[in-house]
From Swiss-Prot:
This is 2S seed storage protein 2. The lineage of its organism: Eukaryota, Viridiplantae, Streptophyta, Embryophyta, Tracheophyta. The mature protein consists of a small and a large chain linked by disulfide bonds. Belongs to the 2S seed storage albumins family. Pfam families: Tryp_alpha_amyl. InterPro entries: Bifun_inhib/LTP/seed_sf (IPR036312), Bifunc_inhib/LTP/seed_store (IPR016140), Napin/2SS/CON (IPR000617). The keyword RNA-binding does not apply. Residues 1-21 form the signal peptide. It comes from the Eukaryota. Keywords: Disulfide bond, Seed storage protein, Signal, Storage protein. GO terms for molecular function: nutrient reservoir activity. This is a 2S seed storage protein. The keyword NAD does not apply.
Length: 170
């Protein structure tokens, strides 16, 4: 009787393990759908960033927003409205035109690549000149809200950290 009970329990355990292994295998197959793509998501976004000519209009817009803080223009606060804040020495019309070009560039990106390419564009703008922490914050804050302003619904806003860390004086 003990042998029969052991045999039944062993059979159930084997069935459970086989079922669990096949479920796991199925999950892996669904999760690894992009495994057939030799280019991972990071390389794909990097390639899109290069093909979109590094989001030139968006970089120009970030530079405009960064310069606004220097000349006493409107500053960025928690209620960030890029469309209202755009100022350009050549006139507000050109500022809105650059915003529209930037939105067009972002709409050409894959939704999963919008934030990574905006991060690369913001990094490029930050590295192009001698910027203090407040200008860098303004660059990243502009990049953070651009998908929302451009009404890219799949993205909303990018999860960039826009706070400036405190550095104690030495």
């Amino acid at each position: 009787m003990a042998n029969k009970l052991f045999l039944v329990c062993a059979t159930f355990a084997l069935c459970f393990l086989l079922t669990n292994a096949s479920i796991y295998r199925t999950v892996v197959e669904f999760d690894e759908d992009d495994a057939s793509n030799p280019m991972g998501p990071r390389q794909k976004c990097q390639k899109e960033f290069q093909q979109s000519q590094h989001l030139r209009a968006c970089q120009k817009l970030m530079r405009m927003q960064m310069r606004q803080g220097r000349g006493g223009g409107p500053s960025l606060d928690d209620e960030f409205d890029l469309e209202d804040d755009i100022e350009n020495p050549q006139g507000p019309q050109q500022g809105h035109q650059i915003l529209q070009q930037c939105c067009s560039e972002l709409r050409q990106e894959e939704p999963v690549c919008v934030c990574p390419t905006l991060r690369q564009a913001a990094r490029a703008v930050s590295l192009q000149g001698q910027h203090g922490p407040f200008q860098s914050r303004k660059i990243y804050k502009t990049a953070k809200y651009l998908p929302n302003i451009c009404k890219i619904q799949q993205v909303g806003e990018c999860p960039f950290q826009t706070t400036i860390p405190f550095f104690p004086p030495y």
